Amino acid sequence: ILNSPDRACNLAKQAFDEAISELDSLGEESYKDSTLIMQLLXDNLTLWTSDTNEDGGDEIK
């Protein structure tokens, strides 16, 4: 993944999307922890996709 930013972004997006579908089944404490992690993941994904776009890559959708 280190040398494959597109793969890393796709994996992060997949993990984020799958986590969203599981939020309803979590207890309050797990929900808080999960949403924090998901926010960090999304922030990183935004950063990574903007870096990729600046380098001439395609944005992950």
From Swiss-Prot:
Belongs to the 14-3-3 family. SUPFAM superfamilies: 14-3-3 protein (SSF48445). PANTHER family: 14-3-3 PROTEIN. The lineage of its organism: Eukaryota, Viridiplantae, Streptophyta, Embryophyta, Tracheophyta. Pfam families: 14-3-3. Gene3D superfamilies: 14-3-3 domain. Signal peptide: none annotated. This is 14-3-3-like protein. PROSITE patterns: 1433_2.
